[in-house]
Amino acid sequence: MVIEMRNVGYSINGHEILKNISLCLQRGRFYGVLGPNGAGKSTMIDILCGINRHYSGEVFIEGKDVKLTTPRELSRIISMVPQNFYINFPFSVKEVLMMGRHPHKKTFTPYTHKDYEVVENIYNAFGFEKFEKTSVMEMSGGEKQRVFFAKALVQETPIIVLDEATSNLDIYYTHKLLSVMKQQVLSAKKTVISVFHDINTALCYCDDFIFIKDGTVTATGNMEQTMNKENLRGLYNMDFKIITQNHRAVSILP
């Protein structure tokens, strides 16, 4: 397994945000995390990425205890595309992408030919040439999200985490970038974990699902194991109509 969480909990001022979360995630799978607002999804993501280390229980990423792993070492294993971006300096797109290579270089050493090659290839693949003279600060929210998707690929980690990372994207770029991530799962056997609010978008790309409500995991498994009326009603407190094709859910409607 790539990721293991054992009885993970997290509280703020006595209020439980996560309660005894236990998960085992495998290599080469696309996981969709679903749940209502305030369920604890982003908190779980922050713990997985080592951003929040004030939790109870244990988290292992590729066999390494997250609490005992340095941020630099962890950033060679897992990359993250957040929902919100805070850039207060006029970096160019290439400069932001080059930050994705930082975990791979030694302190006070220059970037290598490979570093520049990786950045150039992804820069061109994403069509960023038109932003050559534009700072990332000047870009729209959706354009910035595309830059950080690209940075996650530049980082070349076996695990990629997306925390509502398509929230500012139109439908074209949402599906284009999620297709890129799906290809990473299929061709490079990477593990992608993505928080979704749109169930139908998740259906298009995910192999497995994690349902979270009130800080607890209410269901895990593949589509057949999770996407049923009972699980969805318990997750969102409402009824759904599930449209199937060839015994597979293709659309879920209220």
Give the location of each predicted region.
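Conserved ABC ATPase signature
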Residues: 135-139, 143
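Conserved ABC ATPase "signature" region
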Residues: 98, 113-131, 156
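Conserved structural motif at the start of ABC-family nucleotide-binding domains
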Residues: 3, 18-20
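Helix-to-loop junction immediately C-terminal to a conserved catalytic motif
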Residues: 49
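Catalytic Walker B motif of ABC-type/P-loop ATPase nucleotide-binding domains
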Residues: 160-164
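The feature captures the beta-strand-to-loop junction immediately N-terminal to the Walker
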Residues: 34-36
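Conserved ABC transporter NBD signature motif
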Residues: 57-65, 74
